[in-house]
Each structure stands twice: as structure tokens, then as C-alpha cells.
Swiss-Prot record:
<feature type="domain" description="PUA">
    <location>
        <begin position="573"/>
        <end position="648"/>
    </location>
</feature>
<dbReference type="InterPro" id="IPR036974">
    <property type="entry name" value="PUA_sf"/>
</dbReference>
<dbReference type="InterPro" id="IPR015947">
    <property type="entry name" value="PUA-like_sf"/>
</dbReference>
<dbReference type="Pfam" id="PF01702">
    <property type="entry name" value="TGT"/>
</dbReference>
<dbReference type="InterPro" id="IPR002616">
    <property type="entry name" value="tRNA_ribo_trans-like"/>
</dbReference>
<feature type="binding site">
    <location>
        <position position="280"/>
    </location>
    <ligand>
        <name>Zn(2+)</name>
    </ligand>
</feature>
<feature type="active site" description="Nucleophile">
    <location>
        <position position="88"/>
    </location>
</feature>
<keyword id="KW-0479">Metal-binding</keyword>
<dbReference type="Pfam" id="PF01472">
    <property type="entry name" value="PUA"/>
</dbReference>
<feature type="binding site">
    <location>
        <position position="285"/>
    </location>
    <ligand>
        <name>Zn(2+)</name>
    </ligand>
</feature>
<keyword id="KW-0808">Transferase</keyword>
<keyword id="KW-0328">Glycosyltransferase</keyword>
<dbReference type="InterPro" id="IPR004804">
    <property type="entry name" value="TgtA"/>
</dbReference>
<dbReference type="InterPro" id="IPR038370">
    <property type="entry name" value="ArcTGT_C1_sf"/>
</dbReference>
<dbReference type="InterPro" id="IPR002478">
    <property type="entry name" value="PUA"/>
</dbReference>
<comment type="pathway">
    <text>tRNA modification; archaeosine-tRNA biosynthesis.</text>
</comment>
<comment type="function">
    <text>Exchanges the guanine residue with 7-cyano-7-deazaguanine (preQ0) at position 15 in the dihydrouridine loop (D-loop) of archaeal tRNAs.</text>
</comment>
Amino acid sequence: MFEIKARDAMGRLGVITINGKKIETPTIMPVIHPNPKKQTVSMDLINKLADVVITNSYITYTTPELREIAETKGIHELIDFKNVVVTDSGSFQLSVYGDVNVGPMEIIDFQEKIGVDVGTILDIPTGPDVSREKAESDLLETFKRAKDSIKRRKEMGYKLALNGTIQGSKYLDLRQKSAEVMGKMDFDIYPIGAVVPLMEDYRYREVAEVILNSKMHLPTNKPVHLFGCGHPMLFALSVALGCDLFDSAAYALYAKNGRYLTAEGTLHLEDMKDLKSFPCTCKVCSEYTPKQLFNLEEKEKTRLLAEHNLYVTFEEIDRIKNAIKEGNLWELVEERCRSHPKLLNGLRVISKYMDFIEKHDPVSKKSGFFYTGYESMDRPEIYRHKQRLERIQYDKIYVTSVSENTSKPYHENLSNVPCDVDVLIKDSVFGLVPLNIDTMYPLAQNEVPDLYDFEKKYNNEFVSEFREKHTEKILDISTYNYYINHYGKKKDCDKINPDIFRIGKMLEYQYGAKILDDELMGKVKSRRSKNTGRIRNLLLEKEVLFTLRANDNFLIPAKYGAELLHEKLEFPNYRIVIDSSVEEFARAGKSVYSKFVKDCDHELRPFEEVLIVNSDDDLLAYGTTILNGQELMEFDYGVAATLRGGIKK
């Protein structure tokens, strides 16, 4: 069972529950050697740091003394780990040696027998440089084994969860096919396999595309494991692309070669020995100088270096979790991807997939938008803004430029004449910013440095396309000046209240429909904050309809605002339909759980304001969705939406 608690980009801070044990994602599974004598780092440290580990059931199976202990006392006792134990099935050995001495069903039976929490099918790992024919043949065999493994578990009543590995080599259509076929089977976790050769060759562009083409066709309610990814420099990007789990033997393997892991890359202990101190404050790096560690006996040096590598690996995972909570994962990704040019290639290629990524990215975040480089132009916040500009119902449009020194929000720093013309400011980062919505996230909640000329020109084509699309509504400067002069001479009773006009446009941008019709425009009133002077509420006959949330200026409905949205928005827009059995809980303002969602607006994005209705479209409650439209239909565990209030009968 998998539940999302917080999110940013496609990264998910979640909880996986297996056999009553909980794993917080994203996380790393240290690779544990099933033979305790060959384990580099003590299990006391592993138990302290990790919720989950991965070990090899094939080595256990083929080593008589290990097999005997595992079969009599269980895998947890063998490796001395009490929480979740995942096992590989021998696929790695198959990829290295070309053959294994165990059958697909035999290894499933063994993993169940030794009490594994999550087992793995004996799939066929297919490297990146094989022919297409070979990749297709291997994939068909993996499908057969996967189907047989699921059948075996069901027929035998096995309790172990199962990994269903996605294969397909470097062929993206085969990765898509693999995800589609495997995704329809009842697997619990979906590892993306055979990417280690790509990572070893720094082919991060291909790694990113393999992840995305797999994710696009996998069920959203199951965790995704990036098999063999153990270097912390790749974690942030992989999490942002939707990977929840990683496994690492790198902490030990790198230590044996004297390699010192950091979140930005790999250093060599020999090259560091003349430094006064380490660039790390973990227990090992605090107790030893580089020279002291380098001069230790080889076995002890390897152990301590492996401990550092493990510490820094978990430190990066914790940093990513915090970035998800704070809403600045993209900034961390951009920082990490600048640590190596090949990793930057991985970041740049994802712009091709922004239509997919945007569906999973929250509509609002705790942190503002920080522009850290040219790649920031392709972030989902900007992509979404450009799409949602078309939601606004324009009558007359005037497009203009402002000085680079003009502070945001623009409308507070320009001598703009209030009228019913939509004034759009050309913006180097966001393309076009309508003055009437310029306080909404992320249009005012951003920090951008001085840009190079080529960056300033990035959105020229977008602006030209917008002008061409709306050419009949575009006013030139002469027409605009004439119009505002004429408008200014109107009697006050004939003029539109600029605050109400502004709120109307904000509602169109946020909800995709005209919420304030002409009749309502004349009845509603705005209320400004006494402290800031900014619009704070929209009221109708002294009842609050909407409150403008201070941090992002989104319009948050109160009870009467929810009823107005329900009246103005066509079904199923901005709705979550729930089962009749929990109607009263919704009316009482209780959270909506995923298993009770019957239908929804499939275009919902995470953290949008939603209406909770029954199958007859009766309004029951209103609140905020945690999940997007696809997830609402696929998740069957955890909270789907938190409620702000219920509607009593």
C-alpha cells in the first residue's frame, strides 16, 4: 500500500506499508551481502539509517550454509535486519554470467519460504547496446515469467509483495510496452531495470528518457524503484522524474577502490590526503583527517570510507525529502545537474516531456520560483502558466513592455489606468503576464537574476504566436491610448470596479471558466487588508465567497464560494465524486480517502481547490486535492483530498 504525503515536481514524499512495516519514500535500500562475513558496514549502522534493505536471494539459495539459516530462521535473522527486506532474484548474475542455476518459479518459492517482504521475479535484464530483436525477445520472456510469477503467488497463497521489473533496453517504445504490460499485472513495486550500464557510461540523457517513458505508462499508485542507482548525485533528478526507491552497493564498492562519495560527484581519498579536513561533517569525517583515514590498515579504511559513503547517501535523501516539503525540489535538481555536463544533458532532455510532468507538479508551492539558469525556462510552472493564459476570456488586449527595473507585482508599480482592457506585460521568463493576475503564483513569487540577451529572447516566439492567435482583440498603442482616455471620461456608474474585474480574471485563470457574470459583477464587493492594502476577500451580501491566500494569491472558496463554483462550473470540472457510503463524513468536513473516489475531473492537478460531490452532482464539501486526476482514479489507499468545510443538508 502506498500513500502520498507531500510532493514536488514528480517527486513523492510517501509511505509504503508492507507486512505492517512502513517505508518513507524517497529512500535508498543499502545492498546487504547475505553472508555477514562479507558485509562491509556493520548492521547496527544499517539498522539505524535504513527502513529497507535489499539482499540477494540467488546467492542465499546457491550457498548451502546461508540457505540453511535462511530456510530455518528466515532472511531477517540471516542478515540481522528487522524492517523491510527486499531480495533480487538472480537477474544481476544473469546479466553478468548469462545463466543462473535456478528457475523462475523456484526462486519465487524460495523467496516466500525465507520470509522475504518484497521478492523479485527472475526477469531478463537487457543491456543498452543489444539489437532490437534481442531486446524484444528478452522482453517477451520477461512477460511470460512475470505472468507465471503472479499466477504462482496467487495459486499458492504467498504473502510476499513482488517487484515487476521494467525492461526494454534503450528502445523507448519497448520501455513503454513493458510498462503497459507489466502495469496491468498485480505487482506491488515497479523497478526500472538494466540502467546501470547507462549510468556507468554517464549516459544520463538516456537514463532520464528511460525513466520517463516507463513512468508514463505505469500505474501511479505503485512505487517505482530505479534498480542499481546508488550514487547520490543522481538522486535529485531521478526523484523529480518520479522514482521512489533506489538501491546502493556503491557505498561499499566505491570504498574498496578508495573513492569518497559526495552529492556532487566522486573524489579519491588518495587525492584528498593532504587536505586539513574533509568537506563533510559525518561521524567518520569528524573523527579523522584525510591523512589519518588514508594511512589506516586497508580493511579498516574501507569500512570507514564505506560508512562515510552511506552517511552522505542518506544525507542526500534527507535533503531531497526536505526539498519536496518546502517546494524547491526543482532548484535542487538544477543545482545537482550542474555538477556534471552529462547530468545536465539529463535535465535538458526532460523539456520534451513537460506536458506529462506538468500533470504531476503542484499548482502552488511554499517556496517561490528561483531562476537558476536557462533550463528554468522549461519548468512546469512556466509551461502551465502559458497553457492557462488561454483560460482567460479576453475582450480587448493590450500587449506592452516595462522597464527591467520594474518590481513585481507589476500592477502595483505602474501608472496603469483601470479599465476593462486586459493589459499583458511581456516577461522574459513567463512570456506574458496579465496585470489582472500578476499577484498569483508564480508570477509574483519568483526571483530572477539579470538575464543574458539570448535568455531575454527565449519567449519572443511564444508572444508572437499569442498575438497572432488573438489578433482581432489586440489593441495597438494608439487605439489603447484613445480607449483609456474615452473610458476615463465615463461616469463612475458606467465603469467596472477594477478590483472586481481583477478578481473575475483571477477566477478565470484559476478555474477555467467565467465565475463572475455581469449580474454578479454588480453585486459583489471586495475587501482589502488593513495592514497591506491588498485585496483579501470577495463578498456577496456580507458573506465571504473567496479569500485570496496571502502566499500565492489563489482564490480559496468559503462555503458560498464553493456553491458558486458548483453552479458555474460544468460537471465534472473541479469535482471529485465520492461513494454514497461516505457522504455524511464529507458533509461533516472529514478528509476524503482514495478508496471512496468514484470519479473526478481527470485534468485536476495536485493541490487544486475541488468540490466534493456525489453521483448526482449534489455538493457535499469543498477542499484541496492531494492527487491529480489520474491518481484519484488509481489510488486505493490514503488521503485523496483534505476538506475545508462540508455542506449541510
